[in-house]
Amino acid sequence: MVDSLKKPGFEEIRPGVKVPAKETLLTPRFYTTDFDEMARMDISVNEDELLAILEEFRTDYNRHHFVRDAEFEKSWDHIDGDTRRLFVEFLERSCTAEFSGFLLYKELGRRLKDKSPVLAECFNLMSRDEARHAGFLNKAMSDFNLSLDLGFLTKSRNYTFFKPKFIFYATYLSEKIGYWRYITIYRHLEAHPEDRIYPIFRFFENWCQDENRHGDFFDAIMKSQPQMLNDWKAKLWSRFFLLSVFATMYLNDIQRKDFYATIGLDARDYDIYVIKKTNETAGRVFPIILDVDSPEFYERLDICVENSEKLSAIASSNTPKFLQFFQKLPVLASTGWQLLRLYLMKPIDAVSAQGAAR
């Protein structure tokens, strides 16, 4: 009974080492890219900004930040049951996302070292930050008697290939939405310390600045490649990646609304705020942004959430697998239709939006 409280419902590779969460469309992805194409990029158009960002990376503002203090040195067995399960899942998803960034940035730093030294050093220093984050999160998991085998994760995950342009879109949004997620949680718990169930949240203010600087780096890279931002295809891809990132976060978080409730947040309100701020931030580099203030945007996402719950119910039923397939088809079609309608919603011209904001 004690073990079930400490490790509620988690499979283990070996004692204390958790089996990684099953890969789905909603789990953090591991990426690879065309390293030669990236090495050939001419960054001279925006090299001054990239060099300034490199100096910030070298300064390493957070080199003494990720140090566990006395508040961690206690038993956390009072966090049990569903709260414990949800919190471990939160730590695992966060650790996996940070570690995937580490692997990508480390490989880019290695591959670009001789051909594009400025980018190579930036990627190496960002991989340093991501490794710190992943290690800190994995150590936090050990407070709950579990951890991830990051070496096993490296070898067992499928890697998604993206051309450099798409890597930049995806990682820029990942870093910027990470900033808004962390700082929003930090500010909420700063105002409501009674909801801070675990000390890791105290670290989020400085932590999120790493995410912000990384996002600024990808902003600067894209601005060094104007062809990535200035044609009609850039507008279509901007819409695609914005919608993909927002929909993935929304479906993940609403499914785990009980976790956010444990720290005093309403998951839907939290996501609406984070999406709004990330969308505004993306307008500084993307040619278009989404109309996330339209009621239709969340009405359609909420239908996707309902469909996701239906799919989970079908998958966990005793219905034979071949019948489950046919039961899922109309639900999947409905989700696909909602996402298509969201993609086709009229976007907002980012230049006009920035002008209105000023």
From Swiss-Prot:
Cofactor dependence: Fe cation
Enzyme class: oxidoreductase
Membrane spanning residue stretches: none
Keywords: Chlorophyll biosynthesis, Iron, Metal-binding, NADP, Oxidoreductase, Photosynthesis
Entry GO MF terms: iron ion binding; magnesium-protoporphyrin IX monomethyl ester (oxidative) cyclase activity
Catalytic activity: Mg-protoporphyrin IX 13-monomethyl ester + 3 NADPH + 3 O2 + 2 H(+) = 3,8-divinyl protochlorophyllide a + 3 NADP(+) + 5 H2O
Assigned EC number: 1.14.13.81
Record's keyword annotation contains Transit peptide: no
Biological pathway: Porphyrin-containing compound metabolism; chlorophyll biosynthesis (light-independent)
One GO biological process term: light-independent chlorophyll biosynthetic process
Pfam family, any one: Rubrerythrin
Similarity comment: Belongs to the AcsF family.
PANTHER family listed in its UniProt record: MAGNESIUM-PROTOPORPHYRIN IX MONOMETHYL ESTER [OXIDATIVE] CYCLASE, CHLOROPLASTIC (PTHR31053:SF2)
Functional summary from the UniProt entry: Catalyzes the formation of the isocyclic ring in chlorophyll biosynthesis. Mediates the cyclase reaction, which results in the formation of divinylprotochlorophyllide (Pchlide) characteristic of all chlorophylls from magnesium-protoporphyrin IX 13-monomethyl ester (MgPMME).
Annotated protein name in UniProt: Magnesium-protoporphyrin IX monomethyl ester [oxidative] cyclase 3
Organism the protein comes from: Nostoc sp. (strain PCC 7120 / SAG 25.82 / UTEX 2576)
